[in-house]
Amino acid sequence: IMIVSYQTGMEFLQDNQAYLQTNPYLSTFFTLDAPLLKQADKINYALRCEQGDKRLLALKIEPYNLLLFGEEACAPELLRFLFDGGYEIKNYLCASELGYVLMQKMQSYGRCYEEALAMDFMEARSITEPSAPEVETAREDDLDEIFDCAQRFVSDCGLLDKPEKEPFRKILDSFRIIRADGKIVSMARIAPATQDDLRLVLVYTRNEYRGKGYARKVVNSAKNEILTSGKRATLNVDRKNPVSYHLYLSLGFERMFSQGEFRRVE
């Protein structure tokens, strides 16, 4: 059994790049967050736990969740190292199966966790229906409306993020929208992800316009645009949201894996 502790995030990435690439979708956050770790301590850290040919990676950078990637067999050893060393844990994000094992093992340390956010990662590789001509790209003067919808989306999903308006200005051209009655009624953002995919995020339809097929048009048109550019279309869907889930399945999205955000319960 061996635990490797890294001083910087770049060192961690270089050493574990090949392993992270075994599931590039699940490891996206590692690639995004790791460069932010300049000097490891007990609050911000990057670790690898090895047991025979099994391994488990851990990366924690404030203010983000502790990220975990790898095999459940290493969970007890990693936890022992973290608790013995006085490392901060807080909330964590990982594949659901691994998350459940950690949740169970944490109980012996007197810590209770729950899967507060349960997401399925889905992918589409083929066009299933034509794009809708009324779907358009957001303009500069749509900033207020898009920000308003984004805030509603965040509170609907029970996310802890507090979005800021200014950053939205730079990414307006990545939003696809439908208007009705003089306002934006449904939207989705095409966001950069890995080399192979573009991700649909912030998929939102105003309450009073739901069930009228607007989301389907926006999502399908954005999906087609992604596929036409030569990439795969991916998204995360909340497992507690059967309506969205059904919509994505009907547009040819397939579930690849489940991941969860596990929050501490006092």
Question: Where are the predicted features?
Answer:
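Short amphipathic alpha-helix that is part of the acyltransferase structural core
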Residues: 1-28, 124-160
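Conserved donor-binding loop and adjoining core beta-sheet/short helix segment
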Residues: 4-5, 20, 24, 31-85, ...
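Acyl-donor-binding surface of acyltransferase catalytic domains
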Residues: 62-132, 262
